[in-house]
Curated annotation (Swiss-Prot):
Chief site of localization: plastid
Keyword Zinc tagged: no
Name of the featured protein: Photosystem I assembly protein Ycf4
Family: Belongs to the Ycf4 family.
Keyword vocabulary terms for this entry: Chloroplast, Membrane, Photosynthesis, Plastid, Thylakoid, Transmembrane, Transmembrane helix
InterPro entries xref list: PSI_Ycf4_assembly
Spans through the membrane: 28-50, 76-98
Length: 200
């Protein structure tokens, strides 16, 4: 029983891959930037509507008379409000840790269990159970980049192809991994599950 990477634990017959989900630095960055931008827009809109400088902490020379409330201030209010809703959505996905979970590969019992957290409600906990004998192959859906020297694999997403449930993603579909990392995971799983790897 050893940790083979920061998010993978493996013994001879069991492997557990832990999935981070929405609590990664990129998601925190975008949630913070969206919140900051939308609050800035709303402060400018409030300054133009009330003819007061709510941005004095940034610049004492800001003249609220430069931006009339109709139509510029009203438009900025709409953008600021929309930004607040987007920011709220991003912060809630981080709070609920949507997409996090684990992949359990148990050769001894002959099963693969995939668990993910979703949004609150009926699908808050998503649990998929697959028999190892039902797995046909591992699929790397690659994203290639054309350069002068030729085509290169830029990133990819790993799927597990099953007979009954079709292709099940093992990595986040919107978060493509770099080639060495996805090749390493696919190779390790192929060896453990004794299934071929297909690249598309």
């Amino acid at each position: 029983m050893t940790w083979i990477s920061e998010d993978t634990w493996q013994s001879e017959e069991v492997r557990v891959d832990f999935v981070t989900g929405c609590r990664n630095p990129r998601d925190f960055f975008w949630a913070f930037i969206t919140l900051l931008g939308s609050v800035g827009f709303l402060l400018v809109a409030a300054s133009s509507y009330l003819h007061k400088n709510f941005l004095s902490f940034i610049s004492s020379e800001f003249d609220s008379e430069l931006i009339r409330f109709l139509p510029q201030g009203a438009t900025i209010t709409v953008y600021g409000t929309a930004g607040l809703f987007v920011s709220l959505f991003l912060w809630l996905t981080i709070f609920w840790n949507v997409g996090s979970g684990y992949d359990l590969f148990d050769k001894k019992r002959g099963i693969v269990c995939i668990f993910r957290y979703g949004f609150p409600g009926k699908n808050r906990r998503i649990f998929i159970r697959v028999l190892i004998n039902d797995i046909q192959s591992l699929i790397i859906q690659s994203k290639k980049e054309n350069k002068k020297e030729g085509r290169y694999l830029r990133s990819g997403v790993l799927y597990m192809q099953t007979r009954e449930q079709g292709a099940i993603p093992l990595t986040a579909v919107d978060d493509s991994w770099n080639p060495p990392k996805i090749a390493q995971k696919a190779g390790d799983l192929s060896k453990l599950l004794r299934v071929p790897i297909e690249i598309f």
